[in-house]
Amino acid sequence: VSDRVRRLMRAREKMTLESENRLQDFLAALQASPNGVVLLDSQGRIEWFNQIAASHFGLDAQRDLLQHFGNLVRDPGFVNYFASHDFLSELLMSGRQSTPSHPVKLSVHLHPYGQGRLLLLSRDVTALEQAEAMRRDFVANVSHEIRTPLTVLAGFVETLQTLPLADQ
């Protein structure tokens, strides 16, 4: 009987160790993600986050674990997004490191899972926003530059149409 109990205990320890290793592999994969990842419990408290999320939101593992995420991110748009429980779309908000001279834009999306838990994904879209602004400016400038010569040509054609032309 004692041999059987020992074998069962060893098998259980082996399964526990394998589960722990799988969990560590999973957390390492989340840590390597290019996106910020935050796991929230059913009350919105932080259970885990990766380094990217720490830099996006100014989080500290010693200080902020089990704190309510909405209390740490004081962006009114995010507070409304979080309270609405309508997570079909993402939210654009300023990052923690944003300054007037160096704005940082984050795309934040909450995904419900499990028993009321939330997965928060964030990504820095600053470069994307800047590229879109440059594209808009370029299109506006090009359309203005094209419109000006076309206006001159249209005026020239109108002038030619009003002049009496000889049959020569």
Task: List each model region and its residues.
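PAS-family sensory/regulatory modules and their coupling/dimerization elements
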Residues: L65-A127
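Short post-phosphohistidine helix in the DHp/HisKA domain of histidine kinases
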Residues: I146-Q161
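Conserved phosphoacceptor histidine of two-component systems
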Residues: A140-H144
